[in-house]
Structures are given as structure tokens and as C-alpha cells.
């Protein structure tokens, strides 16, 4: 679930506000873009989101320098992290109204998986907030999103520096496993507290004759990483080779 969003996914068409990773084809074929008004809005949106994740990055660095330790740095960036990650819900709307040519279903899945991890796990189970695993996925997300939103901004302006394109299609090699590891370890750390408190679980009997075990649900989410992670990771590796090699060939003909 959250694994798909760790590096902003491997499928989709990007387009400045939708979510796509090493699999978007913006480097290999041109598509009709949004109108002038929509483009202006998307540029502003992506600039704001880039700035937001830069604020998170600076907050992490400042907190580390002040404390001299990487433990419990989450508390120093908790509010901006929640705000800007939740703000990504707008990307679902971008796809729904057609200003970004990405799948509404895929984008919803990717965005909601991150929002779920932030609010339904990290926020709800406060005992895990001091875990190093939280910092692991926060750092991975932060670097990924700074690059991703910068990529979309420059793409919309038709002036994409090769360094940003290279970073987008290369750094996921480290950031994706790093983010996934942090997510899994955080969910795992939350399990005993969820079970003890019966968090978000619904027991029978009740008037709706319905039960839900949040503890088991989290375990299923962790299991879902097993088929999803390798498939997306190697797909992204393949797309990286295709897109960056196409860029190199294009440079030779210039």
C-alpha cells in the first residue's frame, strides 16, 4: 500500500501535479498539455510543494544540528509533514478534472497510502513517533518529493535541467528501498500498541453486525509489500534505462 507511494510510483503520466515515477513517459513522447490557466496553477502548486518539502528538509537539518542526534527528529517537522503530505490530496482532483493525464485510481491509491501512514499509523500510534524507522521514510519521502515537484515545475516550463531528470530517474534506486524499509518497520513497531489498545477495531456484537480488526489489517498491508515492491522496483529500473538512454541519444543528435 504505502510502498507504492514511497517513490511516487512507477506508472502514470506525470504532468505536473499527478504522481508518477520512473515509469512516466514524459522523456520519450510529447502529450497535449493543460491550458495556460491550468499550467499556471500547476506551476504554482508544484513550486509551493517543492518549497514545503524544502522546509521539511531544512527543519530536519536544523533539528539535527541543534540536538546533535538523529533520534526523535520527527517532532521537529511533524506539522509541515502532515500539512504538505495531506496537501497532495489535491493531486487526485487534478487527475479527476483532467488537468493532469494520470489515472485517478492509481493516483488516489498512491496519495492515500502516504496519508494513511502519516495519520492512521504515525499520528494515531504516538509511541512509534520516536522510532528511527519514521525518520527513515521521512528522509526518503523528503528527497523524493523535492526532486519530483522540481521535475514537474521545470517540465511545465519546458526547461527541464538534465540533473533533475537524472536525479528523478536514479536516486529512487536507494530511496525506494529506504522508504519501504522505514514504512514497514514503522507499521511493525505500531502493531503491539494497536493490538493492546484495540485501535480502530470494531468487535461483535454490534447493531451493524460488522467487525474489523485493524491489527490484522496492518499485517495484510505489510504482506502486500511482498509482491508490490519487487514488481515496481524492477519496472522502474527498466524505465530508467529507457528514458535516460533516450536522453543520451537525443543529446548526440543535437
Swiss-Prot record:
Residues 2-41, 98-107, 147-169, 236-254 are cytoplasmic. Catalyzes the third of the very long-chain fatty acids (VLCFA) elongation four-step cycle (condensation, reduction, dehydration, and reduction). This endoplasmic reticulum-elongation process is characterized by the addition of two carbons to the lipid chain through each cycle. This enzyme catalyzes the dehydration of the 3-hydroxyacyl-CoA intermediate into trans-2,3-enoyl-CoA, within each cycle of elongation. Therefore, it participates in the production of various VLCFAs involved in multiple biological processes as precursors of membrane lipids and lipid mediators. The keyword Mitochondrion does not apply. It comes from the Eukaryota. Residues 12-21 have a biased composition (Gly residues). May interact with enzymes of the ELO family (including ELOVL1); with those enzymes that mediate condensation, the first of the four steps of the reaction cycle responsible for fatty acids elongation, may be part of a larger fatty acids elongase complex. Interacts with BCAP31. Interacts (via the third lumenal loop) with TECR. Belongs to the very long-chain fatty acids dehydratase HACD family. The modification N-acetylalanine is found at residue 2. It catalyses: a very-long-chain (3R)-3-hydroxyacyl-CoA = a very-long-chain (2E)-enoyl-CoA + H2O; (3R)-hydroxyhexadecanoyl-CoA = (2E)-hexadecenoyl-CoA + H2O; (3R)-hydroxyoctadecanoyl-CoA = (2E)-octadecenoyl-CoA + H2O; (3R)-hydroxyeicosanoyl-CoA = (2E)-eicosenoyl-CoA + H2O. This is Very-long-chain (3R)-3-hydroxyacyl-CoA dehydratase 2. Residues 198-214 are annotated as: May be involved in interaction with TECR. The active site is at residues 176, 183. Residues 61-79, 126-130, 188-217 are lumenal. One of its GO terms (molecular function) is 3-hydroxyacyl-CoA dehydratase activity. Its main location: endoplasmic reticulum. GO terms for cellular component: endoplasmic reticulum; endoplasmic reticulum membrane. It is a multi-pass membrane protein. One of its GO terms (biological process) is long-chain fatty-acyl-CoA biosynthetic process. It is found in: Endoplasmic reticulum membrane. Keywords: Acetylation, Endoplasmic reticulum, Fatty acid biosynthesis, Fatty acid metabolism, Glycoprotein, Lipid biosynthesis, Lipid metabolism, Lyase, Membrane, Transmembrane, Transmembrane helix. Residues 11-33 are annotated as: Disordered. Highly expressed in testis, spleen, prostate, colon and heart, followed by moderate expression in thymus, ovary, small intestine, peripheral blood leukocytes, liver, skeletal muscle and pancreas. Weakly detected in kidney, placenta, brain and lung. Its EC number is 4.2.1.134. Turns over rapidly through degradation by the proteasome system.
Amino acid at each position: 500500500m504505502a510502498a507504492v507511494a514511497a517513490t511516487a510510483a512507477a506508472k502514470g503520466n506525470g504532468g505536473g501535479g499527478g504522481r508518477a515515477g520512473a515509469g512516466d513517459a514524459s522523456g520519450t513522447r510529447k502529450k497535449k498539455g493543460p491550458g495556460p490557466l491550468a499550467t499556471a496553477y500547476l506551476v504554482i502548486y508544484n513550486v509551493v510543494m517543492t518549497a514545503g518539502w524544502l522546509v521539511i528538509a531544512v527543519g530536519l537539518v536544523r533539528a539535527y544540528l541543534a540536538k546533535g542526534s538523529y533520534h526523535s527528529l520527527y517532532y521537529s517537522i511533524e506539522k509541515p509533514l502532515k500539512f504538505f503530505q495531506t496537501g497532495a490530496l489535491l493531486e487526485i482532483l487534478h487527475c479527476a478534472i483532467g488537468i493532469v493525464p494520470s489515472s485517478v485510481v492509481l493516483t488516489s491509491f498512491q496519495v492515500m497510502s502516504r496519508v494513511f501512514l502519516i495519520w492512521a499509523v504515525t499520528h494515531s500510534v504516538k509511541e512509534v513517533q520516536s522510532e528511527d524507522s519514521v525518520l527513515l521514510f521521512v528522509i526518503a519521502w523528503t528527497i523524493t518529493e523535492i526532486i519530483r515537484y522540481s521535475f514537474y515545475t521545470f517540465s511545465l516550463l519546458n526547461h527541464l535541467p538534465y540533473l533533475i531528470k537524472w536525479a528523478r530517474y536514479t536516486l529512487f534506486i536507494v530511496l525506494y528501498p529506504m522508504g519501504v524499509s522505514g514504512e514497514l518497520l514503522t507499521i511493525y513497531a505500531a502493531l503491539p500498541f494497536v493490538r493492546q489498545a484495540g485501535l480502530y477495531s470494531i468487535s461483535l456484537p454490534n447493531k451493524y453486525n460488522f467487525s474489523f480488526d485493524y491489527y490484522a489489517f496492518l499485517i495484510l498491508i505489510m504482506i502486500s509489500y511482498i509482491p508490490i515492491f519487487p514488481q515496481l522496483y524492477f519496472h522502474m529500473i527498466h524505465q530508467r534505462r529507457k528514458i535516460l538512454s533516450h536522453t543520451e541519444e537525443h543529446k548526440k543528435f543535437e
